[in-house]
Amino acid sequence: MDPLKICENYLTFRSIIKGSTFSPGVFRRWRFHGLADVVGNIVEREEGRFWEIVPETHTLWAVFRGGFTVAPFTEILTSLQLENRGRQLAFLAFLSFLLRNWPSDSVVSEDARLDLVCAPAWSRIQIWSQAARLINDLPESVFEGQGSVVEEEQGEEHLARDSDDPFFD
């Protein structure tokens, strides 16, 4: 399963994120894409880690309460790395976590929250996917003579640590 491929269509992506915010059970499994159930299960399993990243006292929640989302999402999305399936699933789960825990007294209606989260995230995913396709389509001759042996060894070491587990330590 390639999460980025599945999320190419905005409405599908939006539906997956929305579905992942529902409690586990028959409704989530049958009403939404299978990826919504996977993402929802990750959120439930790793919720403690998400709370460590963004504790209840974090200013992000106050910003969301006030309806300001552009600056926080810009900061979150610019550092986004989606090299492998684990990171992709972790990112989708983090979006679901934010929506599940959005302050109920926020000036933003529940309907608008989904699009405030999904629109910039989907745009970033599309940019990431396009860049990855362009790099993969480059001829090998472009890369000849670039990089040193040390850089290649570091790259191999990074790949050795790469995992599909969304929270690989």
Swiss-Prot record:
A Pfam family hit: Adeno_E1B_19K
Disulfide pairings: none
Keyword Iron-sulfur included in the entry's annotation: no
Keywords recorded for this protein, A-Z: Early protein, Host-virus interaction, Inhibition of host apoptosis by viral BCL2-like protein, Modulation of host cell apoptosis by virus
Superkingdom of the organism of origin: Viruses
Region Disordered, annotated ranges: 147-169
Composition-biased stretches (Basic and acidic residues): 156-169
UniProt record, GO biological process: symbiont-mediated suppression of host apoptosis
InterPro entries: Adenovir_t-Ag_E1B_19kDa, Bcl2-like
Protein name: E1B protein, small T-antigen
Organism, as annotated: Canine adenovirus serotype 1 (strain Glaxo)
